[in-house]
């Protein structure tokens, strides 16, 4: 069996430094995950990524500080007040410190993401960030993961100790969520204006999403010069109205991660490529960033994700070792 000739020509150009277009991104995503073309895509992305990032893998961590039934009602999120099984809970300072200490003890954590609810008060968010900033090593970056916010608030996040923020134009925005694309992009613009690093990815990917839909959102991360790009699949939640679609395989996620790598790898602003949730196929397809997790997790139905869907630092290190990475 021979690979598609148009595909092979594009792959050769990518290896020579070509930055792919939206149409080429869509083309690469159109191949079946079991195809020869998908296998080549993953292999070349892995090789390019290891060259550009010097074979370094980065460990990130996320603490889900709060959980509550959320009026945002994202159909893919376990916090949605339409179908959540969670009750309201917020970590106290001691619990936050313990989680932060566990993540940073080995000195191998590049950045710690602090996740709050969409409607957590902004003052509470600033308080969490400032307390953790004072607690953890100065070299460890802090990522803010919260709802939409203004340019003024972005400046306040930075002043409190945040180095970056995670924010995404999500698949199904405005249909599977109660938020508009304009709201999400306005917040991304606020992040960039404040000088915060933009953490971005294509998510939450389901089997129903088309190559055209994915390509549009993938390319938007490049338009905004994201610091980290990546790919995240939607996890099926039994009570979610999206459960009827099921979820993509890790093989398909790896293929999409590889295409994201092609899009982002030549950007001077890109620091790493993430795959969520962590898995070896993704790390062998261009990704070099994975997250350990504790506390609440919007892809989990357990109030403590660590030991359920979430990995700890040691598990992340073992996964990197199995995939032949050097941990930065």
Over which residues does each language-model region extend?
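Auxiliary Fe-S-binding modules of radical SAM enzymes
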Residues: 1-33, 222-328
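Alpha-helix N-cap and loop-to-helix initiation/capping positions
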Residues: 2, 91, 124, 178-183, ...
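N-terminal [4Fe-4S]-dependent radical SAM core
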Residues: 24-75, 79-87, 107
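Mobile, glycine- and charge-enriched loop segments
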Residues: 49, 53-62, 69-71, 75-80, ...
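Core AdoMet radical
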Residues: 65, 81-98, 102-129, 133-188, ...
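Conserved C-terminal portion of the radical SAM core fold
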Residues: 111-114, 182-242, 257-271
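Catalytic cores of alpha/beta
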Residues: 150-157, 207-221, 276-285
């Amino acid at each position: 069996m021979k690979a598609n000739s148009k595909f092979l020509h594009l792959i050769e150009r990518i290896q020579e430094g070509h930055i792919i277009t939206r149409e080429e991104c869509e083309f690469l995503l159109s191949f079946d995950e079991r195809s020869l073309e998908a296998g080549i895509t993953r292999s070349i992305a892995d090789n390019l990524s290891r060259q550009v990032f010097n074979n370094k893998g980065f460990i990130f961590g996320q603490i889900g500080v709060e959980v509550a039934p959320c009026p945002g009602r994202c159909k893919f999120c376990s916090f949605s007040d339409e179908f959540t099984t969670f009750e309201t809970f917020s970590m106290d300072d001691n619990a936050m410190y313990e989680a932060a200490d566990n993540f940073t003890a080995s000195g191998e954590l590049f950045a710690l993401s602090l996740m709050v609810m969409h409607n957590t008060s902004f003052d509470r968010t600033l308080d969490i960030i400032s307390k953790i900033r004072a607690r953890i090593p100065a070299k460890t970056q802090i990522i803010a993961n919260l709802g939409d916010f203004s340019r003024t608030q972005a400046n306040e996040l930075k002043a409190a100790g945040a180095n970056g923020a995670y924010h995404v134009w999500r698949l199904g925005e405005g249909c599977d969520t109660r938020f508009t694309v304009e709201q999400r992009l306005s917040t991304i613009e606020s992040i960039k204006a404040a000088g915060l690093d933009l953490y971005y990815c294509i998510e939450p990917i389901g089997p129903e999403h088309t190559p055209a839909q994915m390509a549009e959102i993938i390319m938007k991360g490049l338009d905004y010069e994201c610091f980290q790009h990546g790919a995240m699949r939607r996890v099926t939640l039994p009570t979610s109205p999206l459960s009827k679609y099921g979820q993509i395989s890790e093989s398909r996620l790896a293929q999409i991660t590889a295409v994201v790598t092609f899009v982002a790898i030549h950007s001077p602003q890109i620091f790493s490529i993430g795959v969520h949730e962590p898995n070896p196929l993704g790390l062998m397809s261009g990704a070099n960033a994975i997250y350990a997790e504790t506390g609440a997790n919007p892809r989990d139905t357990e109030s403590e994700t660590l030991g359920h869907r979430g990995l700890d630092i040691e598990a992340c290190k073992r996964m990197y070792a199995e995939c032949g990475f050097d941990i930065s």
